[in-house]
Amino acid sequence: WKPESTEWYHPVPPKVTPGVGTSAPSDAIILFDGKDLTKWEAAGKDGGSAKWAIKDGTMVVVPGSGSIRTKEYFGDCQLHIEFKTPIPGKDNTLQMKGNSGIMLQSRYEVQVLDCEDNPTYVNGWVGSVYKQSAPLANAFTKTNEWQVYDIYWKAPRFGTNDELESPAMITVVLNGIVVQNNYVLKGNTPYTGLPKYVAHGRMPLSLQDHGVEVAFRNIWIRDL
């Protein structure tokens, strides 16, 4: 063997300028810029305008207004999203304490929850793949502080007859701590019942209205 027999020069990877501080990489799709919800719509069957509020450069769940989803569809991706849970009321405990969710392809949930002194079930903690995989650590800092998610998603693949060819896989980093490490999903993430796969293609990213005024900011995504 010659050294050059295992070297190649094409295709040349594209140049991407990394973000500095809180800015996104040069090839990222900005899903929320702190100004408006033009990249989002209501997640119901008929779509329509997203009804969440814009406050001080963040978007905030309006309880009862419904979940929202991106107008654009995604498959494999790198997602950056920051969230802040509010100071809870007396009735906001367990799964009602700062609850929302990040629904990859509108059906695979990474949990958003205030896990400061919260004795709820561990596969429903922040950093969990909801009701499938508990986080490797509780990396939540404090109530009413910004938390940072970086999520690396490999979408499931389906064959010509809608059979599952390869399951979804996810790595989740919360506040710089790996909380899911190449976890292989068993299917979707239902509240009741067992996970299962139903064939689909590229789908929107959804954010959940769970009746709590969770705030989000600095949301961007890269197609992989």
Predicted regions and their residues:
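Carbohydrate-interacting regions of secretory-pathway proteins
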Residues: W1-L224
